[in-house]
């Protein structure tokens, strides 16, 4: 494999001049630049980026943690991150935690051992005191998750307001008994969403029952289970605000299968505005989340920190959400 030394000797220039051409440095004459580029092409020279990054103490790589790549929300988040890192000449490693605390800590070891320049956490499995010691090794950013103790940049959306908006929509449709679904019970983001649900009920002098609240619901099969729990209740909710569109689709599927009319017998709101909302019959009313932009913004902020142009001190960036009204309500 040819080296910079060989290119320099062939062109009768210094190694510094060759390096400047490789790095697109402006202070090289056009004549010398063309000569060096021709030699590089003839010798089929390929720069050793690994060695270069080692000298710079940078990997040009960011890690992204998600619980599962087959969930549509996180697939979109990965898409947003991947597009932006390519545009910025970085690479991304996607790490699945499967909602496991130890797996998340193993991801953070990549930062400690300088295998990545920064980490974007798409979920948060551990308490912050388990995460914060790794900040001395490089930047960490929370995306789609919150923690009150995290003294770093957090990019997400207003979970409280999104839930409040959805529940008020159901109330305005005439519903007085409204259920609620969420996924991880220890997530502060999910807690904020639940608070939005409860505040909407309170503001309209409505009450809820504990059996109308369903936790750890993630996918279509969980939606099946939610419906059957609702069906077996003596005092059923007439509407339900779900944690994501997959759960909403599962509820609707089983409701229709069991002779329920949606929304007449059971109104359903999803969350995320996934494509499944437009495939299911009836189509699903949902909360639209700018997931692609969420990923893009996370990349921009963490690269700013990696480059030394900005710190990731405590700040919360909230992207806008909106209610998309369809047939299920």
UniProtKB/Swiss-Prot annotation:
Transmembrane segments: none annotated. Pfam families: LacI, Peripla_BP_3. Residues 4-23 bind DNA. SMART domains: HTH_LACI. GO terms for biological process: regulation of DNA-templated transcription. Gene3D superfamilies: 3.40.50.2300, lambda repressor-like DNA-binding domains. InterPro entries: HTH_LacI, LacI/GalR-like_sensor, Lambda_DNA-bd_dom_sf, Peripla_BP_I. It comes from the Bacteria. Keywords: Activator, DNA-binding, Repressor, Transcription, Transcription regulation. One of its GO terms (molecular function) is transcription cis-regulatory region binding. PROSITE patterns: HTH_LACI_2. Residues 2-56 form the HTH lacI-type domain. PANTHER family: LACI-RELATED TRANSCRIPTIONAL REPRESSOR (PTHR30146), NTD BIOSYNTHESIS OPERON REGULATOR NTDR (PTHR30146:SF136). Positively regulates the ntdABC operon and negatively regulates its own transcription. Binds to NTD to induce ntdABC transcription. This is NTD biosynthesis operon regulator NtdR. It comes from Bacillus subtilis (strain 168).
